[in-house]
Every structure is written in structure tokens, then in C-alpha cells.
Design a protein with these regions (language model features):
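Short beta-strand-to-loop junctions in surface cap/lid or active-site-entrance loops
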Residues: 24-40
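The feature captures the conserved acid-bearing segment of alpha/beta-hydrolase catalytic domains
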Residues: 36, 139-203
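Short, surface-exposed "cap/lid" segments of acyl-processing enzymes
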Residues: 37-68
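Conserved alpha/beta-hydrolase
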Residues: 67-84
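Alpha/beta-hydrolase active-site loop
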Residues: 84-104
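Residue in the alpha/beta-hydrolase core beta-strand immediately N-terminal to the catalytic nucleophile
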Residues: 110, 133-135
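Gly/Ala-rich beta-loop-alpha elbow adjacent to hydrolase catalytic centers
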Residues: 112-121
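C-terminal catalytic histidine-bearing segment of alpha/beta-hydrolase fold enzymes
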Residues: 197-269, 273-288, 292-295
């Protein structure tokens, strides 16, 4: 059963469906600071990862989610006990939460997730139209080469299947150097899939200065990408791939002027020509690589 706390509902508590026992949607900020559906820019639900050894529901919310709050969004997290945390059950629970927030009047619903949380965010985005954007950092659900040698590659193939099933949401994905759960090569393929489906998307592949599976949790990631992600989540962008300049690189969202956030170093976007839409950002070399050329080299 999915439980909504009173603070989340900004009303009476509400129990929904049977998606996952004791899975709970709670505020990721002080409950008194929630703006409510009529005043907030939208709602963000962050989903933690999954571990066989500890309860990831106790993990802190990453710093970049706080920038959404500062920009006028209401922020939540989906807490899931590991004993009941499966892709089908948690994906269904998250889809249910997104639908409920949309029905309660939030103009935008964004799902952000780390690792296993990224997978269930994409699952939810494939189940209905309530999800406006997905932010997935270090997506994984099938262990490492050491812990699951027979299934580790599903961190790639499973991801591709989920990307192909996204119905309408914008998708931002981050892959990090030194991630033991990453089979490698996922950035270009993910970009190609999203482009083929006509979805607005952002792929950041192994950015310099950010390494390991948990790179998105800290200050460095938030400083470089949080305000950019706020803009990506809020903007009405045409289909294609978009450049997210790190550290507040100046650019404009095509046809929209700029994106205003309270971040001290706001990053904005540049729309690429249609012929460049099938590309992935390579921050190590400082250029965008054509997907087909990258794949031919493999």
C-alpha cells in the first residue's frame, strides 16, 4: 500500500492502491515550507537506490533536490523498505504517486532517482502521462560485475528497454566514471534511443570531476548541474538533445529567453540544430559526439 503523509497531501492522509506495502511518499523538505499545488512550480519526487545490506530509505536526499525547493518546487521522496522494493512494485507505486500529485493540481511532476531509483522513475514514466520529466543518476538495478556476473549487463539492456517505453517525459541521464555498476557505453545508446522516440533529453556521460556510483549525492554535482536541471524540468522544450553547460555556462532555451532560478550560477540551455539531435555530450573532450560514429568505433 502506498501511503501519503498529511504533509504531502497538504490535507488528510491518503492511502492508495496496493503497489508496495509500506512504501511512503514524504516531504524532502520541512513540511511547513511546502507551497502546495497552486503556488509551487511543480512537484519533484526523489527515489533512493536499493541495497541488499542496508535500508537506503535512510539515505539523505541529494543536495541538488534542495535547489528545486529554492526555485519554488515542492520536493518529496518515495521511501521504500528493501524487503518489498522490486522494480514492478516500486515502479507502480511511483507511477501512482505521480498521478495523484497531478490530480491534486501540480502543474508539473518530475521524477528524480539514483541507481535503482532511476530505473523505477523510468518505469513510472512508461506507465502513464502524469510524469513530465525524469532525472536519472547512475541508473542501475542488476548489481555489479562482481556481485552479479550473469546479469550485470542488464544495467544496460534493461535501461534501453525502459527508455524505449517512456511515453512523453523529458529525460536527463547522468553516467559517471568509476561506477562499478555501469557496463560502459550507455550514454551514446541512450541518446540514440531517446532521439529516435522524439523525446527532449539530456545525456551527460562521464563528466570530469565527478566519479563513482554516488557522484550525484554531493555538493560538486549540485553546483554544476542543479540549476540546469531546474530549467530542464520547467521548460517546454522541443524534441531533441540539449546541452547542459556545467558551472553556469551562458546559453538560451530556444524560443523561451532564459530560465530564471534563484541559484547563484544559473545554467541555461542551447537548442541544437535538428541534424545534431542524435548526439551525446562528451565533457571530457569538450565536444558532442555523433552517435553513429561512436558506435562504429566500438
Amino acid at each position: 500500500m502506498l501511503l501519503f503523509t498529511a504533509a504531502v497531501a497538504v490535507a488528510a492522509p491518503l492511502s492508495l492502491g496496493t503497489a508496495a506495502a509500506q512504501t511512503t511518499l514524504v516531504p524532502a523538505q520541512d513540511a511547513a515550507s511546502l507551497l502546495g499545488s497552486q503556488q509551487a512550480q511543480g512537484a519533484v519526487i526523489w527515489s533512493h537506490g536499493r541495497s541488499l545490506l542496508k535500508e537506503c530509505s535512510l539515505a539523505p536526499t541529494p543536495e541538488y533536490i534542495g535547489v528545486f525547493r529554492a526555485a519554488g518546487w515542492d520536493t518529496f521522496r518515495l521511501n521504500r523498505p528493501r524487503i518489498t522494493d522490486t522494480l514492478p512494485a516500486s515502479g507502480a507505486a511511483l507511477a501512482e504517486a505521480a498521478e495523484t500529485l497531478k490530480q491534486r493540481g501540480y502543474r508539473r511532476v518530475v521524477l528524480a532517482g539514483q541507481s535503482f531509483g532511476a530505473f523505477i522513475s523510468l518505469i513510472a514514466a512508461g506507465r502513464g502521462d502524469a510524469v513530465d520529466a525524469v532525472i536519472g543518476t547512475a541508473p542501475a538495478a542488476y548489481g555489479s560485475a562482481e556481485s552479479n556476473p550473469g546479469g550485470f549487463l542488464q544495467n544496460a539492456s534493461g535501461l534501453y528497454d525502459l527508455l524505449g517505453a517512456v511515453r512523453r517525459a523529458r529525460v536527463a541521464l547522468f553516467f559517471f566514471d568509476g561506477d562499478i555498476f555501469d557496463p560502459g557505453g550507455r550514454g551514446p545508446v541512450a541518446d540514440r534511443i531517446l532521439a529516435a522516440h522524439g523525446l527532449s533529453h539530456l545525456v551527460i556521460d562521464k563528466p570530469a570531476g565527478l566519479s563513482t556510483h554516488w557522484a550525484a549525492a554531493g555538493t560538486t554535482f549540485a553546483t554544476q548541474y542543479a540549476s540546469c536541471l531546474v530549467g530542464f524540468a520547467a521548460a517546454r522544450l522541443a524534441a531533441g538533445a540539449f546541452d547542459c553547460g556545467a558551472q553556469g555556462a551562458p546559453a538560451q532555451i530556444a524560443g523561451m529567453g532564459g530560465v530564471t532560478t534563484p541559484s547563484p550560477a544559473p545554467a541555461r540551455f542551447t537548442s541544437l540544430p535538428q541534424g545534431n539531435s542524435a548526439s551525446v555530450i562528451d565533457l571530457e573532450s569538450g565536444r558532442r559526439e555523433d552517435v553513429n560514429r561512436v558506435l562504429r568505433r566500438r
